[in-house]
C-alpha cells in the first residue's frame, strides 16, 4: 500500500485525483524508518507535485530532519528544488528549515548556503531578503570560496538587495546601473505578404485538401486557397476539377452518387471546391437563401461575423457555377488580413477593363479590410465606377469607425426567456449605428453596423474567433468593443480563452484607442493565467509599436480596481510577468496610475503584492518622480506587514536615485545571528 500510493503520487495528476493517496498514507501512519526509505520520493514530490501534495512531502521531510534522518546533502537537494517553486508558503517554510539546520550544525554551511541561494531568484523580494539574511547570519569571515559561489548566485537578486549583497559578498557580476538601463521590448509584429501568383493546380488541390481536414486554418491559408480556386476556375475549371477530385476523394460529398451537397455543411475553400466539382445546386447558393448561423440572438456579434464570411464564400461558389470571377477583390495584401488601398484600386481597374461585375459581398469585405488612406481616395474616385465612389467615401470620413460611449452598469445580458441578470458593477462600451455600412453594404453586413450594447444576449459556438478578426483587420477599436464582454467574463466569472483573441487583435491595424486599452486592462485581471499572459502579450505589442498610452491604461486599471472587476493580486501577477521580460519602465508607467485605486480608500487586499512589483520596476529602471496618491500614508504605517514594507521600499526607490540609494532597512554583517 505504501509503495503503490507513493508511486501513484509520483505519476502526478490533479490535486483531487491525488488526495485519496495522501490521505491513505496518513491513515497508514508510516514509521520513521518507512519514511526514510522513500526519502528520494519525498524530494521528488516536494519538487514537482501539485502544491498540496508538495506541502505534505515537505512536512514529511521536515519530520525526518527533526528525527536526524535527513543528511545535509539531501536537505540541500530538497531545498534547491523547493526554493525554485513559485509558492511563497513552501519557500518560506523551506527557509525556516534551512535556518534550523544551519543553527544545528554550522559546519554544513558549505552545503546548505549554496542551496539557500536558490531563493535569490524568487519573484518575491521579501523571500529574497530572508534568504540573504540567512546567508549573512551563517557565513564566516574565512569562507572565501563559498563567498565567491554565493556572489555568482546573487546576480539574481533585485537591484536594492544586489547592492546589499555586494557589500557582503564582494564584487557581483553585472551590478544594476540605472544610468545604463535600456528597456527591452519585443520586436513589432512582422507582416508577411500574401501571394497567390504562380501556384500550380497540384499545389492548389493539396492546400484545399489539407484545409478540408482541419479546423485551425489561418487567415493566410484560407484566403490563399479561396483566391487560387477562383483564379484557376476562371482559367480552366475542367483542369482544376481534375486536380481536386483525387485530392478530395475521401470527402463524403465528393462522390458522384450522393447528389448535390448541402452548403450548410460546407465552408470556405471546401465550399468552393464542391462548386468546382459540380456538387452544389446554384439555387441553394442564392443570396436570398437563409444562412444557418452559429450563434443565437440578434445581439451575437460572433454569429454576425460568421454569416459575413459564409455569405462571401457562398457568393464566390455561385459565381463559380454561373459567372466565374478572375480573382477576388478582398484577398488581403498581408497575412493579418489587411488590404492595401492601391491593391484594391488595381483590382477594380482590372475588373473594369474586362467588364467584370464585382461580387457585392466580396467588395464589401474588401472595404472592411482596406487600410484607410485618405490620399488614395482621389485615385478611387477617378475610377468613375460605383465601386470607386464607395471606396473613396470609405477611405475618408464616411468609413471612419463610429465613436463608442462608456458607462458603468450592474445589469447583465438579457436571458433567452426575457429576464435580465444582475452582475457585479462593470464598465460597458456601446456602439452607435454605422450609417455607411447600413446604407452601402449588403444586408448580411448590416448587423456589423447596428447599435450594439454589451448587455445584449450572446450565445455562440466557439472556435472561429481568431478567423473573425480578419473581417475588420483595420478597426481594432470596434473589435475591442465587441470583445470586452468576453474579457469581462474572464475577469469576474469563470470564462476563459478571450485573452488569445486580444493578443492577436493588438497586432492588427487601425487606431489603438480607449476601447483597446480598456480591453487590455480588463484582461490583465483575468481569472486564468493563460488569459493574463495573453493580455501581457497585447500590452507589450502595443508598447513595441509605440501605440501604448500608459497613462490611459493606468487610469482604466484604477477604475477597474475600484469596481472590483480587476483584483490586485491578479494584476500583480500580470505586471510581474510583463516586467520580467525587461519592460520595467513600461510596467511602472502603467502601475503608477493604477496604485492610487488600492491605496486611497484604505489599502485593498493584495495591495502589498502590487506595491512589491511596482518597487521592483522602479529599482530596475531607476524611475523617479512624484509619489502615487496614497503611497505616503501607506509607507508611514507602523509594523512589518507586506503593505507597509513594500510601500516604504517603493517610496525609497522613488525618492532616491538608485545609483546612490542605500538600503537603510537591511544592514547585514558576517556571523549575525537571529535571521
Model regions and ranges:
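DNA-binding alpha-helical recognition surfaces that contact promoter or target DNA
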Residues: 133
Amino acid at each position: 500500500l505504501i509503495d503503490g500510493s507513493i508511486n501513484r503520487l509520483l505519476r502526478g495528476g490533479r490535486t483531487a485525483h491525488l488526495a485519496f493517496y495522501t490521505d491513505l498514507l496518513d491513515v497508514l501512519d508510516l514509521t520513521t524508518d518507512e519514511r526514510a526509505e522513500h526519502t528520494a520520493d519525498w524530494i521528488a514530490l516536494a519538487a514537482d507535485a501539485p502544491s498540496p501534495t508538495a506541502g505534505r512531502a515537505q512536512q514529511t521531510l521536515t519530520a525526518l530532519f527533526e528525527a536526524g534522518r535527513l543528511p545535509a546533502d539531501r536537505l540541500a537537494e530538497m531545498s534547491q528544488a523547493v526554493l525554485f517553486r513559485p509558492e511563497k508558503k513552501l519557500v518560506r517554510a523551506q527557509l525556516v528549515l534551512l535556518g534550523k539546520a544551519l543553527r544545528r550544525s554550522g559546519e554544513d554551511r558549505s552545503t546548505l548556503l549554496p542551496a539557500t541561494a536558490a531563493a535569490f531568484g524568487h519573484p518575491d523580494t521579501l523571500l529574497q531578503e530572508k534568504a540573504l539574511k540567512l546567508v549573512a547570519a551563517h557565513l564566516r569571515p574565512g569562507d572565501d570560496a563559498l563567498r565567491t559561489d554565493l556572489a555568482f548566485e546573487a546576480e539574481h537578486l533585485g537591484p536594492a538587495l544586489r547592492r546589499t549583497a555586494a557589500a557582503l559578498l564582494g564584487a557581483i557580476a553585472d551590478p544594476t546601473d540605472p544610468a545604463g538601463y535600456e528597456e527591452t521590448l519585443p520586436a513589432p509584429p512582422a507582416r508577411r505578404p500574401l501571394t497567390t501568383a504562380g501556384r500550380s493546380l497540384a499545389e492548389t488541390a493539396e492546400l484545399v485538401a489539407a484545409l478540408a481536414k482541419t479546423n485551425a486554418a489561418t487567415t493566410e491559408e484560407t484566403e490563399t486557397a479561396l483566391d487560387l480556386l477562383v483564379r484557376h476556375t476562371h482559367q480552366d475549371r475542367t483542369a482544376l476539377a481534375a486536380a481536386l477530385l483525387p485530392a478530395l476523394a475521401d470527402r463524403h460529398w465528393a462522390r458522384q452518387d450522393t447528389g448535390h451537397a448541402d452548403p450548410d455543411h460546407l465552408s470556405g475553400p471546401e465550399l468552393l471546391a464542391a462548386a468546382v466539382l459540380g456538387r452544389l445546386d446554384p439555387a441553394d447558393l442564392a443570396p436570398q437563401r437563409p444562412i444557418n448561423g452559429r450563434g443565437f440572438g440578434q445581439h451575437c456579434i460572433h454569429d454576425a461575423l460568421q454569416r459575413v464570411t459564409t455569405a462571401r464564400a457562398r457568393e464566390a461558389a455561385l459565381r463559380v457555377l454561373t459567372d466565374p470571377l478572375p480573382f477576388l477583390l478582398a484577398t488581403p495584401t498581408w497575412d493579418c488580413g489587411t488590404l492595401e488601398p492601391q491593391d484594391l484600386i488595381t483590382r477594380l481597374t482590372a475588373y473594369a477593363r474586362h467588364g467584370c461585375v464585382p461580387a457585392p459581398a466580396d467588395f464589401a469585405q474588401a472595404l472592411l479590410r482596406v487600410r484607410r488612406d485618405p490620399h488614395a481616395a482621389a485615385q478611387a474616385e477617378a475610377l468613375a465606377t460605383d465601386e470607386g465612389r464607395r471606396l473613396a467615401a470609405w477611405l475618408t470620413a464616411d468609413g471612419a469607425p463610429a465613436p463608442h460611449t462608456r458607462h458603468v452598469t450592474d445589469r447583465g445580458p438579457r436571458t433567452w426567456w426575457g429576464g435580465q441578470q444582475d452582475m457585479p458593477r462593470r464598465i460597458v462600451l456601446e456602439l452607435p449605428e454605422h450609417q455607411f455600412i447600413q446604407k452601402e453594404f449588403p444586408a448580411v453586413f448590416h448587423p456589423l453596423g447596428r447599435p450594439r450594447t454589451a448587455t445584449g444576449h450572446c450565445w455562440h459556438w466557439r472556435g472561429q474567433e481568431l478567423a473573425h478578426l480578419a473581417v475588420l483587420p483595420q478597426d481594432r477599436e470596434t473589435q475591442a468593443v465587441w470583445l470586452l464582454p468576453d474579457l469581462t467574463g474572464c475577469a469576474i466569472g469563470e470564462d476563459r480563452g478571450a485573452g488569445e483573441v486580444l493578443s492577436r487583435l493588438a497586432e492588427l491595424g487601425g487606431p489603438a484607442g480607449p476601447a483597446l486599452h480598456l480591453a487590455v486592462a480588463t484582461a490583465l485581471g483575468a481569472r486564468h493565467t493563460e488569459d493574463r499572459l495573453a493580455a501581457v502579450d497585447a500590452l507589450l505589442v502595443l508598447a513595441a509599436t509605440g501605440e501604448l498610452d500608459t497613462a490611459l491604461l493606468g487610469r482604466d486599471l484604477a477604475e477597474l480596481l475600484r469596481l472590483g472587476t480587476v483584483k490586485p493580486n491578479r494584476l500583480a501577477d500580470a505586471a510581474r510577468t510583463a516586467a520580467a521580460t525587461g519592460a520595467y519602465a513600461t510596467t511602472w508607467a502603467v502601475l503608477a496610475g493604477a496604485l492610487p485605486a488600492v491605496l486611497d480608500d484604505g489599502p485593498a487586499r493584495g495591495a502589498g503584492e502590487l506595491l512589491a512589483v511596482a518597487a521592483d520596476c522602479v529599482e530596475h529602471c531607476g524611475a523617479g518622480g512624484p509619489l502615487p496618491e496614497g503611497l505616503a500614508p501607506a509607507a508611514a504605517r507602523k509594523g512589518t506587514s507586506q503593505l507597509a514594507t513594500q510601500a516604504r521600499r517603493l517610496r525609497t526607490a522613488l525618492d532616491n536615485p538608485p545609483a546612490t540609494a542605500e538600503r537603510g532597512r537591511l544592514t547585514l554583517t558576517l556571523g549575525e545571528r537571529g535571521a
